[in-house]
């Protein structure tokens, strides 16, 4: 447990986004308490990296979201909470929906209650910023699409120009979509019902350094790592599905801005991604990887996954305005930077990896 009186608590803080956020906050002079079960590949390495960079700023608790007492103890003195820990794989939720429920819904509710009760006793209102997902909008099957340059694109010119906005009705698909969607709504309702300063960021596809490349940790890094290792890539679907991608440093800036502006944005949900300018198909990403590597990549195709969207691009206008966000990193530059970082990690020279600030 942290010896610091009022740390920033990051659940899932040893993960990809969490470790980038922890690094930024510690660099800004905040003490950070990481709450993480350390079950996913690579997270122990992220934690060691953080503790080596910030030995006096980073402390950690190894525990599961389902451990209510450990969660309550971690939240007790926090001056802010970034809730990133979750069961994140649609495929895993299909195999064990109850485990998915316990982690994503019960764990989130336990955290909210711990923050609320400690706040009542101590006479303070602790901000909670929650990492949600674009999956809360369902499979978007009602959005007419057409093929444009070997990628799906909406027929509706407004959606094509800007993406999917927060006005889109929620439509939970798969156990994962249901659990994250319910957690999303609980976080928002605690602002309405209990005046807890909360905000929700519904993330699209995030990529960047400290992403370890398993499929559920992000397909951009997964594709890059397999390509760098000379291994084949499997695409589920036809590869024409489109997502907007956002670089890690830009994502971290959005979380920090949400905390800094929490009184202005409390009770609101924002779509967070690279937006229409950074919308790419899986095939387009592979073509760019081949360009960066100077050789072809072996690709095979599997069946579509349950609930997979043919098209999802975030309309980021609300987030950019409310959070004061700059234009994000161009995806081609970001993918090249991630490839450089992965090469440095693979060579055992992490100090050679690039350090990138938000665009």
Name each model-derived stretch.
Residues 1-204:
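N-terminal Rossmann-like NAD(P)+-binding domain of SDR-like oxidoreductases, especially those catalyzing
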Residues 11, 102-105, 176-177, 213, ...:
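Short, solvent-exposed loop/helix junctions and linker helices
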Residues 21, 27, 59, 63, ...:
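C-terminal substrate-binding subdomain of Rossmann-fold SDR/epimerase-dehydratase oxidoreductases
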Residues 39, 66, 89, 100, ...:
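Glycine-/small-residue-rich active-site loops that bind phosphorylated ligands and cofactors
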Residues 44-47, 184, 221, 283, ...:
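Short, surface-exposed alpha-helical segments at coil->helix boundaries
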Residues 46, 89, 216-219, 223, ...:
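Activation loop
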Residues 70, 80, 99, 106, ...:
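Residue-level recognition of oxygen-bearing side chains
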Residues 140-162, 175, 185-259, 277, ...:
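NAD(P)-dependent short-chain dehydrogenase/reductase
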């Amino acid at each position: 447990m942290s010896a610091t009186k009022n740390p920033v608590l990051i659940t899932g803080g040893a993960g990809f986004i969490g470790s980038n956020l922890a690094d930024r906050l510690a660099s800004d002079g905040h003490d950070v308490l990481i709450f993480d079960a350390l079950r996913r590949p690579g997270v122990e390495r992220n934690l060691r990296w953080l503790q080596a960079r910030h030995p006096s700023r980073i402390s950690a608790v190894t525990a599961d979201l389902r451990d209510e007492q450990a969660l309550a103890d971690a939240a007790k003195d926090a001056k802010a909470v970034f809730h990133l820990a979750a069961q994140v794989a649609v495929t895993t939720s299909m195999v064990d929906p109850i485990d998915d429920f316990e982690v994503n819904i019960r764990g989130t509710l336990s955290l909210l209650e711990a923050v609320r009760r400690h706040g009542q006793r101590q006479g303070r209102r602790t901000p909670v910023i929650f990492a949600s997902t674009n999956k809360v909008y369902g499979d978007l099957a009602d959005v007419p699409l057409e093929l444009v340059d070997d990628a799906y694109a909406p027929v509706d010119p407004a959606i094509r120009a800007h993406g999917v906005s927060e006005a889109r009705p929620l439509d939970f698909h798969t156990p994962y979509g249901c659990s994250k969607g319910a957690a999303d709504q609980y976080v928002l309702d605690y602002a309405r019902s209990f005046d807890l300063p909360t905000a929700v960021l519904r993330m699209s596809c995030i990529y960047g350094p400290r992403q370890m490349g398993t499929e559920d940790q992000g397909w951009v890094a997964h594709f890059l790592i397999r390509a760098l290792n000379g291994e084949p890539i499997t695409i589920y679907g036809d590869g024409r599905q489109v997502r907007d991608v956002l670089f890690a440093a830009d994502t971290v800036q959005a979380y920090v801005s949400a905390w800094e502006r929490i009184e202005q944005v409390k009770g609101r949900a924002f779509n967070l991604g690279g937006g229409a300018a950074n919308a790419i198909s899986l095939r387009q990403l592979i073509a760019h990887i081949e360009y960066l590597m100077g050789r072809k990549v072996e690709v095979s195709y599997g069946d579509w996954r349950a609930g997979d969207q043919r098209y999802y691009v975030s309309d980021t206008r609300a987030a950019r305005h409310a959070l004061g966000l700059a234009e994000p990193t161009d995806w081609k530059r970001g993918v090249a930077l991630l490839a450089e970082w992965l090469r440095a990690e693979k060579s055992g020279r992490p100090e050679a990896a690039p350090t990138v600030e938000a665009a």
